[in-house]
Structure formats: structure tokens, C-alpha cells
Amino acid sequence: MNTIHHLSQYALQELKDSYSEHEIECICKIIYMDVLHYTNIDIHLRKNEILDESFINKFIGIVRLLKSGSPIQYILGETEFAGLRFKLSPSTLIPRPETEELVRWVGEWLKPGNRLLDVGSGSGCIGISLAR
């Protein structure tokens, strides 16, 4: 179990009771992109290359945390929202796709020079996304 292909198969076997096959593929892709800094193309081109043992151990640890119910966003400590990366911790809420849609709508509604106050923002994703 030392290539992307093998690790993805391992994750599929370990997480199949909690996630769909498509969700597991997406989670693996997120891990490869976040930890290895691979692009989507790298993942496919390098799927049979031997990986560093430290990454393999980290991957297995992430799968164990996922299996215990921890969200991938908390495990990695960040998430994407409205095209931006945000730091997260268990004390902040994970932004939802519905919130991202709301931010898009409000962004279209706001006019230059409008002021907006974001109170109790948690990760700050709403206010920061609207400010840019």
C-alpha cells in the first residue's frame, strides 16, 4: 500500500460503510491536493508512483479520523469557500454550500460603497468573501 492507487483502494475499503464511493474519491482527492500539493492531473499521472512513508502514515491517520466521524475540513484544518481558503477548527462551523450561494446572491445585491457588518462570524468566510 504505497501508491495513490493503493491508498485510494484502502480508503474505499475502510470508509465504505460511512461514505459513498464518489464521496471517498473526492475525499482522497482533497487529501492528495492538500497534503501532497498535487493537482488533479498530478493525481492521475502519478497514481502508481511510490509515495513517501510519512505521507502514507498521515493518510492512514486521516482515514482513521474520518472513520471515527471527524469531518475532513476539521482534520485538514481548512476548507474552500467562494473560491478562497479558510482556516477552521472544531470551534468554527464548516461553511455550507447554501451559505456560499447566499454570499453570491448578497454580493450581486451589494453596491460599491455599501457597508456590511459581519457579527459572530466564526471562520469569517461570509464577511471576507463579500469584502473581496
Feature roles, as predicted:
Residues N57-R132:
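SAM-dependent Rossmann-like transferase core, predominantly class I methyltransferases
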